[in-house]
Amino acid sequence: MTVIFPNFSKSSVLIVGDVMLDRYWYGPTDKIAPEAPVPIVKVNKIIDRPGGAANVAMNIASLGARSRLLGLTGVDEAAKILKKQLNESNIKWNFISVRTCPTIIKLRVMSRNQQLIRLDFEQYFNNVDTTKLLKQVELYLPKYKVLVLSDYAKGSLNCIEEIIKLARYMNVPVIVDPKGIQFSRYKGATLLTPNISEFESIVGSCRNEKILINRAQEIIIDYNLSALLITRSERGMTLCTRYAAPLYFSTQKKKVYHVTGAGDTVVGVLSAALSSGKSLEKACFLANLAASAVIKKSGTSTSNVTEMKNIMNSHICTTLPVGILDEKTLKQTISVVRNRGEKIVMTNGVFDILHSGHVSYLTNAKKLGDRLIVAVNSDGSTRRLKGKTRPINTLEQRMFILAALTVVDWVVPFYEDTPSRLVAYLSPDFLVKGGDYHVCDIEGSQGVLNRGGTVRVLNFQTGCSSSNIINAIKRKN
């Protein structure tokens, strides 16, 4: 994916949510306490950083974008520290001071780059009249291009349904970083960004990618969302939308020091990029670059454009759509993997009733290279090739089953009688067919050979064919 970094100074984001102070006590650990089997930490450094929704604002500010933060705090020293640090980062804020509740503090004790314990100083903001907060949102929302709702389930967003309705009325995109199992609260939002644990707490354990994608689509439909972005720590991110194939934003394996605040970084960079006019896909790409940077840092951190560019230039982070793709998207994806030196294998067929012969053949085809494309005859093409009674399964059904195979990277349909045009357009390194073909008889073979590619004929499992299966069923009936 080719991404030009936006001019973030033109971005504007309104953040509403649970603000908190992340406090860190650092010190060496050399011995065990005599009164209990616990380590003694000699604290020699204390660091305070804005956390929660405030960390989202810090990440936006680190890009040079304009933002405003709305939320609830107590009337205490922590609130003063939080406001001071936000001022130093040129972040505008409007907090409602609640005398009956303290400002939320998350205290982490750190030693030798390890977190030993976390102590939470907080009280749920219940019985707090959020009318003032709603009025502030109504006042400031027209001045910003994107709205972020950072929900840590601390009570600041008890009026979240009304805020989302207001944003929809004003036609402002809403990004929600959710918490808890009541996703119905976020109905009508543009995008939800749960981490994998939060997502599975709603839909149950996802044993494989296909289950995860299907359940994500159900969430999108049930709650009238435009998209769902699932963050997966060092495994990157998965973007699901209503009508397009899922996108996987993966990171190379690296040492992960801390994931504290990584979700805030994703939401912050994502919102700033969307506000600048980037597409959702490119905004997610940039957010994943930033997350790749912050998980290597200690404590609550932010990322900047320079770090993101360095990661992109070193090819640490890539984005690859998988599964069923259109020709244009597939062509772009092939270009990405080719730049990394990967070899492309392509085959084609009807694949009407998938059987063990198909699976064995596709497995052997994949071994020739790094990525396997399966081009599938359309229903009309199949009828012209096989007769009026075929296909048994529709094009959509056949492609769905093929995309579920782990050896298949991409599935693409073609509507002509032969795949020659598609083969020429995609230019695979290996063109493969199974059966008794001669290389010169394989459609598209000459073009592949002329470009320096390879054409191979693989053995097909004897006796295995869709036609044989259909005839056997007819005989039994």
From Swiss-Prot:
The entry's keywords: ATP-binding, Carbohydrate metabolism, Kinase, Multifunctional enzyme, Nucleotide-binding, Nucleotidyltransferase, Transferase
GO molecular function: ATP binding; heptose 7-phosphate kinase activity; heptose-1-phosphate adenylyltransferase activity; phosphotransferase activity, alcohol group as acceptor
GO biological process, one term: ADP-L-glycero-beta-D-manno-heptose biosynthetic process
Catalysed reactions, as listed in the record: D-glycero-beta-D-manno-heptose 7-phosphate + ATP = D-glycero-beta-D-manno-heptose 1,7-bisphosphate + ADP + H(+); D-glycero-beta-D-manno-heptose 1-phosphate + ATP + H(+) = ADP-D-glycero-beta-D-manno-heptose + diphosphate
Region (Cytidylyltransferase): 346-477
This protein's record includes keyword Ligase: no
Record flagged with keyword Kinase: yes
Pathway: Nucleotide-sugar biosynthesis; ADP-L-glycero-beta-D-manno-heptose biosynthesis; ADP-L-glycero-beta-D-manno-heptose from D-glycero-beta-D-manno-heptose 7-phosphate: step 1/4; Nucleotide-sugar biosynthesis; ADP-L-glycero-beta-D-manno-heptose biosynthesis; ADP-L-glycero-beta-D-manno-heptose from D-glycero-beta-D-manno-heptose 7-phosphate: step 3/4
Uppermost EC category: transferase
Active site: 264
GO cellular component, one term: cytosol
Binding-site residues, ATP: 195-198
Coiled coil residues, start to end: none
Region (Ribokinase): 1-319
EC number assigned by the record: 2.7.1.167, 2.7.7.70
Matches recorded under PANTHER family: BIFUNCTIONAL PROTEIN HLDE
Assembly description: Homodimer.
NCBIfam families the UniProt entry points to: cyt_tran_rel, PRK11316.1, rfaE_dom_I, rfaE_dom_II
Described function: Catalyzes the ADP transfer from ATP to D-glycero-beta-D-manno-heptose 1-phosphate, yielding ADP-D-glycero-beta-D-manno-heptose.
Protein family (similarity comment): In the N-terminal section; belongs to the carbohydrate kinase PfkB family. In the C-terminal section; belongs to the cytidylyltransferase family.
Name of this chain's protein: Bifunctional protein HldE
Organism per entry: Blochmanniella pennsylvanica (strain BPEN)
Source organism phylogeny: Bacteria, Pseudomonadati, Pseudomonadota, Gammaproteobacteria, Enterobacterales
Encoding gene per record: hldE
